[in-house]
């Protein structure tokens, strides 16, 4: 019991936390799969490496990211208290995915309080994986 009390005393709480889970779905519906992996295996599309959560509370901004293949993430208690605008962005090995290659949920506004966790639930990020490449009629694909 004393160990639990000591461990709890070591937790650094400056704000609230945010928890979310994610799945990737094909944008066009051409895929026979309802969901796709972070590495879609499609020529012209490269793996989504990480998922990033950005927040803005007043003039304060911050972010946290997790390996895409975790499909779940929780920030530390670092999100400032107040009305937070929360956005999710897929990240490629070379940086942010091009906005035309994915559709994420619209920014969510949530009230954050010190020591509490806001749960965004399970979100779906739609990724472009059809007609990838540089030929005529092709389009930009996720992380391509």
Please give the residue ranges for each predicted region:
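Short amphipathic, basic-aromatic surface patches that mediate peripheral association
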Residues: 21-43
């Amino acid at each position: 019991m004393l160990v639990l009390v000591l461990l709890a005393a070591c937790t650094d709480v400056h704000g609230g936390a945010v928890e979310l889970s994610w799945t990737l779905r094909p944008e066009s519906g051409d895929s026979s799969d309802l969901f796709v992996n972070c590495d879609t295996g499609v020529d012209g599309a490269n793996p989504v490496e990480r998922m990033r959560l950005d927040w803005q509370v007043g003039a304060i901004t911050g972010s946290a990211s997790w390996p895409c293949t975790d499909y779940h993430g929780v920030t530390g208690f670092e999100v400032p208290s107040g009305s937070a605008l929360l956005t999710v962005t897929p990240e490629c090995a070379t940086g942010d995915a091009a906005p035309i290659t994915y559709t994420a949920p619209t920014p969510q506004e949530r009230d954050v309080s010190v020591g509490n966790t806001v749960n965004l639930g399970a979100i779906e990020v739609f990724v472009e994986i059809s007609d990838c490449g540089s030929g005529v009629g092709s389009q930009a694909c996720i992380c391509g």
